[in-house]
Amino acid sequence: MSMLRYLYPAVCAAVLTGAGAVHAAPVDLTGWAENGLVNNGAGIWTVQPGNDSVIQSRNGNPTVFYDATPAGASAQGEQLSGSIEVLTTGDDDFVGFVLGYQNNEINSTTADFWLIDWKQNDQNPAVDGLALSHVFGDLTTTSGSGTGGWWNHADPINEAARGTNLGSTGWNDQQKYTFDLTFTEDLIEVFVDGQLEISYSSTDHGSTFTDGSFGFYNFSQAQVEYAGITQTTLPPTTPAAVPLPAGLPLMLVGIGAFGWMRRRQAA
């Protein structure tokens, strides 16, 4: 019986060693910060024990709770995961997320980030359902009565896509949903309860996406919990070659020499 039969699995294992598994790491939300339209304090974000969950308790203007740590300023190449739940039955407005967000960008005259928002019920001119919008331009124009385009996705909040299944379906009171957000310079993906709802590429957009932080978003909706937040580094788009272990060439030479000797003895 050929020795190769026994050595082949060992060779394969040696090649694969070091490829490494990807693991989700808990996110410490104590380094995150609130920004509110017009003035900070539009939302009250209270980090919960364990530091990987937060509850937003104010019904007010658009508010963002974003990763303000130096490491969090570049979220591209990462996936943010966790759960979202509206804990009350008393309102029906917007919950969601931001991608590629910079400090105080919600009040910028030159904003450029992405908004994922989900409304429970129609409320003219706002409609229910899950949507992705490009927030681009002067947001100081949105601070008037009714907070402008935040309500109905009017410029400079420019709707780009709606959820495949939830595009016209609102969230339910006191129901926990899981979410996974993929963000690279070329791709935004939104999964809800394991189902891909939105997949939007730089080709769809016409250019690559601007980098920035992950964040949570509420508008006119209180008692929203984001829980069990984790972050995972995504594998590269083009997988890098796995380097050969240092001893592998000698192992292969030995296998070749053994085979040559067996053939010579059999001759």
Task: Name the predicted role of every residue range.
Residues 16, 94, 98, 213, ...:
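Short glycine/serine/threonine-biased micro-segments
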